[in-house]
Amino acid sequence: MQTVTLYQRDKMEDKYMAIIKPFVAVRPDAKVADRVAALPYDVYNRAEASKEVEREPLSFLKIDRAETQFPDSVDTYAPEVYDKAKEIFEDMVSDGIYITDSDECYYIYSLVMDGRRQTGIAACASVDDYMNNVIKKHENTREEKEQDRIRHVDTLSAQTGPIFLAYRSKKEINDIVSRVMEQDKPLYDFTAVDGITHTVWKIAEKSDVENIKKAFENIGEIYIADGHHRAASAVNVGLKRRKENPGYEGTEEFNYFLSVLFPDDQLMIMDYNRSVRDLNGLTEDEFMKKIEEHFDIESLEEAKHPDKKGKVSMYLSGKWYMLTAKEELLNITD
């Protein structure tokens, strides 16, 4: 069977148009949503994840990090760990912890942290848009981290972590989002243990769904703000399923991946800093010479944010430096 590509060509501007589609959600029952909610899987080490799952047995982390259900002697990436994740997920669906909606919808997802609200739309993005660079990337990925999420998503046949996407704000979408938030009762509204308030509304009106879909087609480029490994993993699972189903038509769920899209005027990009406790036995002079092997070093009078890829601000012994990666370092995966 001839396969159907998932992108459209805008003949007027000769560009691809993004496909951001509604989906049938498998989501927590409202009575337990605050208990199911969990931080991203990769912010915990194994011991911390086990402790969190012990504290809250309904936490999604129990699915995301199923090695918590095994003794430490079992490897984190053992096949039985992924099988266990699938078993837990299916049991929770059977027990009504998760429910399945009946129609394809978009969902408004609003977060409030320290009094600041950020609101986006949960939807499915296209594997082909990722492959054709309609969805822009700005980070490299590590294969071992990708493989973990590939096995997880493939075993569960479920997208278990949304990709954080950003797009240029569009009035047509904003108007629908504002109206639904004002008029409709939210599906969920709770404050998690980390103090962040999560509120979700469903966009179910067919005219709203269609208008949002059309509005996204005219957005142009979309950017990955966070979740490069999750995105690459989801796409690889989609490509794997295509090979396994050579007659695929393009409408199958594996051709899409779960995302939350935020307009640019809602975004607050926070620093992603690292604190190093010691110099691993080196003196400061020795440490700076090691740094100089791979970076050009500029002394600064005060703190300064990096303004492009390959630059790092460093604070050492009361002084700021700007490090600029040398050419041979820029092509190494992070």
What is each of the regions a protein language model found here?
Residues L6-R9, E13-D334:
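Surface-exposed, charge/polar-rich loops and edge strands
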